[in-house]
Amino acid sequence: MKMKTVLVIINCIFLAIGNCGGPLMMRLYFQNGGERIWFPSFLQTVGCPLIFFPLLLSFLRRRRCLEEQETTPFFLMKPPLFIAAIVVGLLVGFDNYLYSYGLAYIPVSTASLIISAQLGFTALFAFFMVKQKFTPFTINAIVLLTGGAVVLALNSDSDKLANETHKEYVVGFIMTLGAALLYGFILPLVELSYKKSGQRITYTLALEFQMVLCFAATCVCLVGMLAAGDFKVKHALFIFKNRVIAGEARDFKLGESLYYVVIVFTAIIWQAFFVGAIGLIFCASSLVSGIMVSALLPVTVILAVICFQEKFQAGKGVALALSLWGSVSYFYGQVKSEEKTKAQDTQLSQLPVTDYVA
């Protein structure tokens, strides 16, 4: 099995864990007394220091392979890519806020169906920004996955949360749709940053990009927390000594200890999502990453039904079938495309070589 295939599988696993587990952890936070918006936004990217460990291993491996007189820098990222990572990170910070705001007022299943729209946005932006080519299988997958989202939308009228006003629901819906639009722009922007960086993008470099991106997004959310009054201590970075957060922990319905368990695992799980999403852009393309996100959304819906007793209507079953069909269609198209490319390469290699004398 080729290393690239292994990386695709690993990143798909990370993406599945983060894409399915992240919204559930945030719903657990809001359902049991969590009231902050910027704080869960902050948790989505604050786990970025975890990326330091694979980067350290990569550095040690590079240094071991070099001769004694040669040196290797710890970070391979050059200024253009570093600046691009910061810009993308700022957008991710605001996207996190939009998504957290929406999830505070709408069920996970409803949020998932709205986020499905990001696939269409990703395809549109990828077409103009990185000249992403569409095959019939890709178009079929997009239509099926988008159709699944539409079916869910038509069956979400009874999904309002308890004690929720119509205004809160509408605002939550709009904010989540905005998150889908912005994320649909972010994925091709990352791919464009790779192409315009002037560097050969390796998986190590993709991880460095991810760490800088998440750090910038975390800073945005940290400023938002300060502005929203989420900190009541002199040194804002001491999360666990924060009077606002500590008070929320004491009032958490599952208990103070489980409150901290929830926020720690929320940070870890969301970091898995970002590593998987950015990794898939490196291994394949932004459109592949977007399709995988959309393909996993019905799984999130089913988990929400199981964990939070959200209603599972017939429309959600139809959406799940359409999503699976779309995913199979896309991957089948990828296999056929690779087979066609290999066949063409084989034909070219078998052409007779003749000497031409002028």
Curated annotation (Swiss-Prot):
Name of the protein described by the UniProt record: Purine permease 2
InterPro entries assigned: PUP_plant
GO cellular component: membrane
Localisation per UniProt entry: Membrane
Broad class of where this protein is predominantly found: membrane
pH note: Optimum pH is 3.0.
Protein task: Mediates adenine transport. May be involved in the uptake of cytokinin analogs.
Keywords recorded for this protein, A-Z: Membrane, Transmembrane, Transmembrane helix, Transport
GO biological process per UniProt: purine nucleobase transport
Signal peptide (from-to): none
Membrane topology: Multi-pass membrane protein
Entry similarity comment: Belongs to the purine permeases (TC 2.A.7.14) family.
PANTHER family in the record: OS09G0467300 PROTEIN-RELATED, PURINE PERMEASE 2
Regulation: Competitive inhibition of adenine transport by isopentenyladenine, kinetin, benzylaminopurine, trans- and cis-zeatin and trans-zeatin riboside.
Lineage top rank: taxon: Eukaryota
Pfam families for this protein: PUNUT
Regions crossing the membrane: 6-26, 37-57, 74-94, 110-130, 134-154, 170-190, 209-229, 262-282, 288-308, 312-332
Location of the EamA domain: 46-154
Tissue: Expressed in the vascular system of leaves. Restricted to the phloem. Expressed in flowers and roots and not detected in stems.
GO molecular function, one term: purine nucleobase transmembrane transporter activity
